[in-house]
């Protein structure tokens, strides 16, 4: 009988010690707000066309990391919904096929890509790494090749 009470006492002691450790750990945390830097806030794509709508249906965010070798042109393509490109490293030159507009985006910069306009990106002398976030919906591809072109990725 004494053994039963001793085991219960040990269990209670361990539970109390665990709780005390959790409380001490939380007390050691410094609570503070982070510093915000808006990288991109826009209602239009880089080529000047306004975003008109989001796709209907269940929203689905998709973020990809795209690595493109030096001196590479991606195939011509479109996107069916808004997305944001952030250049982690390298340089990306965007080309709008219909208008001929171009935009050079450097490491640390973000840009809103065009929706339904045929475009592509080209890299410079070094590998370019992009972080791309799409505001889409399930079942709809994030990139659609232009007629006669291969997939962007």
Positions of PLM-derived features:
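Short acidic-glycine-tyrosine-enriched beta hairpin
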Residues: 68, 99-116
């Amino acid at each position: 009988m004494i053994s039963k009470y001793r085991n219960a006492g040990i269990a209670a002691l361990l539970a109390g010690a665990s709780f005390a450790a959790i409380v001490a750990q939380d007390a050691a945390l410094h609570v503070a707000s982070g510093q915000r830097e808006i990288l991109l806030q826009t209602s239009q794509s880089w080529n000047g066309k306004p975003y008109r709508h989001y796709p209907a249906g269940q929203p689905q965010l998709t973020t990809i990391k795209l690595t493109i070798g030096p001196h590479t042109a991606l195939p011509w393509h479109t996107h069916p919904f808004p997305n944001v490109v952030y250049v982690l490293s390298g340089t990306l030159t965007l080309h709008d096929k219909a208008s001929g507009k171009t935009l050079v985006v450097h490491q640390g910069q973000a840009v809103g890509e065009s929706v339904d306009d045929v475009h592509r990106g080209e890299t410079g002398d070094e590998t370019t790494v992009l972080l791309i976030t799409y505001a889409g919906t399930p079942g709809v591809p994030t990139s659609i090749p232009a007629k006669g072109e291969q997939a962007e990725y």
